[in-house]
Amino acid sequence: MLGVRGSTSAPGADFVRYGGHTSCIAITPEGSDRPTLVLDAGTGLRSLTTVLDGAAFDGSIILSHLHWDRMQGLPFFAAGDRDRARVDLYLPAQDDRSGRDLLAQSFSPPSFPITPEGLRGAWTFCALADGRHEVEGLAVTAIDIEHKGGRTFGLRVEDAQGSLAYLPDHAPAAGLSSELLAVLADVDVLVHDAQFLESERPLAVNFGHATVLDSVKLARACRAGTLVLFHHSPARTDDALDDIAAWVPELARDLPVVVAREGMTLDVVRH
């Protein structure tokens, strides 16, 4: 996990142990020695260059939606801005616009000095529809989920070894469709929005996010093997996240729950 925050990064001494970068996770498939699929390109994406130890990135990036905290790492992803790099970037399709044009909304002057064409390496920009796809040899299912301010996908990624669902921005209190529960059914690892607490529910509703309790309820409903609490509030300090880690097992009972940390590695295997 390269970035576990939501909305904006969280610098400072109170945010060191869990990390301050915005959302980005890198997936290394069975048989590979390096990540080939990245979910979201928050500020944590910059750290992937260090993980790759000087090598150019050769793989795909899928954005769950187009809010700034999902894209701010792209302009500073050195491993993707190299002559030997290959990057297939998938953005949620909307308004019949091309993937390139969707990216250029924030990745072009005056917002940024260059346009998508200014990136070195072999980049493709793909408008991703909902449904099942094959990306980097992995089965990827994209499904529309409730969130505020533009089309947002929940993603399920799986191979023969196991399955991971990624819903970093989700308002489950707005309703859970039978289609979503079917996509998430029996997932091995559920990475889910847990930005707010029950005492902050009005904020969760207003901004289109979830509470920790929402995440636990969804994990139970879809029979997830492990729940990973993700998309931490930029105001949630290390000590506050430690507190959540201390009380959430009683709430979750027999459901294993992990509080996401920057730099954390998870093995995704069948449960």
Q: Model regions: which residues?
A:
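Binuclear metal-dependent hydrolase catalytic cores
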Residues: 1-165, 175, 241-271
